[in-house]
Amino acid sequence: MRISRRQFVSWGLAGAAVLGTEGIGGAFYGHVMRTSSRMDEPIPSVCRACPAGCGIVGYLRNKTRLTAIMGNPEHPTSRGRICALGMAAMNLQLHPERLWQARGKDGATLETPQALAEAGGRIARLVAGGARVVIDTWDEQQAHADFMAALGAPATLIGREALEYAAREKGMEKVWGTEVRPDLDRADLLLIFEDQPLDSGSRFMPEAQRIIDAKVDRGMKLVVFDPRLSTTGSKADVWLPIRPGTARPAALALLRHALEHVNLSQPVSMRGQYVPLVILAETIGAYTFEYAAQVCGVDVALFAEAGRLLVESYRPATMAGLPVFEREDAAAAYAAIALIDLVLGPLQIPVMPRPRQVPTDQAASPVAAETIYREIEAGQGKDIVLISHRANPVFERGDALRKALTSGGVAYHLALGPLPNETTDVADLVLPETTPLEVHGRVWLTSFVPTPTYVEQRPVAPPPKGVLRTQDVFGALAKHQANGDTAAPVYDLQMVRDLTGANTFFSVGTGIFACDAGYDPKLRYDVSLRFFRELPPFELHEPEVLRPVLLLHDGPVTNRTSAQAKWLAEIQHDARLFLHPDDARRLRVHPGDLVRCEAVDGAPGAAVEVRVFVSDGIRPGCVSLPVEQGHLVAGRLAMAKRFSTAHDPDMKMIWWEDEGPGVNLEPLLRREIDEETDVVKRPLTRLRIRKV
C-alpha cells in the first residue's frame, strides 16, 4: 500500500488531535512546561491588575512556585481571554525589588511584628486624640471595613477603583437613571465617541473581545469619533478625527440625518412626555453635516459615510468615553449621544452600581477625596492618619503632595504594598504586603452577566516568607484599636440584595457565584426637549494652531501604582509626544527631537520634556501623551537602570536604559471640582511647545 504525503499529514494531524484531548475532564487542565513533563496545579482566580476583573488560572508547581498565568475559560465575562498586563502580574510577584521587611522613614528595617505593633499603637493614640483615618486603596476589601469598625471613630475610605470612572457613571445616571453599556451581542453598528475600548478601560477585555467577535462573526460596523487614531480607531470602518469636546454637534448631526429616513409621526418619551419625532427633527434642524463638519473640523464626506452606515443599520448603539463627561459641554454632549439610542434603539443595558465593601457614608465621593488631598497639600491635614494601600497618590498628584508628606503634612502616614513607589518613599512606615495574586477576596461582575455575579479571588501563589496577607495586616492593626474585636457586616452582599431583591447565590462555575435576581431597572430618558431648544450655539475657542490641545491616553501595559514589570517595560518603556506632521513643520521639530511642554494655564515653571513622534494618526492642533508613565523613584526597573544580575538574570538584557522611563504628566494637568454632579473633571489643557 502506497501512502501519499497528503494521507500521511492528515493521519498525523488526526492522531495529534486525539492525543491533545486525552485527560481533559473540564475547563482546566494541568499546564505542561515546555522544558518539563511535570504537571502544575491549576488554581482559578480573578485578575486585579485593572477594574475589569478578568478570570485567570494560576499554575502552581509543588505548592510553592507560580509558573504561569492564563485566562479562565469558565469566567462569564472574559471567557478565557487575558491581556499582557494580566499575564505579567506573575512578574510582579517575583519582582527583584519586592519589599520583604518593614521600613521606617529613615530607611531602617524593622521586623514585621514590631512594625505592626508600633503602627497599631500609634494609630490608636492619634484616633483617641481626635485624628481621622483615611484609607486610600485601589483594592477595596472586607479587611478595610473590619479595621474601620474597630477604630471606634469616623473613618473614610478612598476606593480608587470605584472613583476612576465616576464622571461617566454620574453622567449616565443623570440621563438614564443608571449607568448603561451598549448591547454588543445584538448591535450591528457601534458609534464610539472619544473612547478606546480596544485599548483600555474599566471593562477592557470583555468589551474588546465582544467588539472584535461582533465584527468578525456578524459584520458589525464601527464608527469612531476620536481626535487620535488609537487601536480602536484603526479597526473602525469610519474614523472621524473630531476636535476634542465636539461630540454634541457630531451626534446631533447624525441623528438629524437619520430622522430624514424614519416615520416622523412616531413619538419618543423625553422626561416622561411623548414628543413626536417631527418636533424633535425641527429642534435639531440646524445640525447639518456641513455645520458639524465645520465645528468638528473634519471632511463632510466622512459625516456622509457615517450617516449612510447609521441609516442602513437596524440595531445601532453608542458608546461614550470618559473625555465626553469631563468637558465643559459634558451634559449636553452625552444627552445628544443618548438621544441616538432613544430614537433608534435603545440597545443599552443597565449596569448595576459596583458593590462596595464599606457603607456609603464611609466611602469618599470624588469631590471628598479631592478635598482631602487639597487639605493635605495646603498644610491643613495635621489631624489625618493616612493609610495608602496599593495606591500611589504621590505619583498621581505630584510634587505638591510629595512635599506635604515629606514635611509632616499629616499626623501619620502608613504605606502598605508589595513594591516600592513614590508614595512609599515618603511614608513614616512602610509595611510589606502581599500582591493580589496571594490573597483571598471577592470581585463583583456587574456587566455582561444576566445577574450580579461574584468571583472568588483565590491565592494562586503563597506569599514570601515573612510577608503577611492583607487580611492579616489590617487584622493586626485592628487589635490595637478601641473596638479591636469588632467585625463589620458583609456590606457588599447586602447591597446586592437590596438592589436586586436576591435571596440566594448559586454556583455557576469554579469559584463563581450568581444571585437569583437580576438588576433590570426600566431605563427612562430624563432629558427634556426644552433642554435641547435652550442649548446655546456651539462655540469654538481660540484657533488650535496657537496652542495645541493635550490628549491623554491609557497604556494597557503600564501600572501607575508601582514599578513596571520587566516584560511590560520591554513592550512600552518610553513616552512619546504624538504630533501631526503639519504641527511638526510649524514648530520646526522632527521625529526624536526633545521638546519642552508647558501648560498655558499651569503653574509657573511647570513643564515636562519629551521626545517627538510625528504621525498622521492624530488631528492637527492636538498632541497626545500616555498618562501612566514616568515613575520618579519606583525602583531601578521603572527608572530603566541596570542592577546586579544576581537578583534577576534578565536585568542584563535591559536595552532601553538610554531612552528613559517616560514622563510624569502631573505638572501639566488640572483638576476641577464639579459640585453639581459631585465629580472631579480634568479639563482640556493647552500647551506651549518649544524645541529644547
Located regions from the model:
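Short, glycine-/Ser/Thr-/acidic-enriched flexible segments
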Residues: 63-65, 72-76, 88-89, 140, ...
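Flexible glycine/proline-enriched surface loops and loop-helix/loop-strand junctions
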Residues: 194, 235-236, 287-289, 319-322, ...
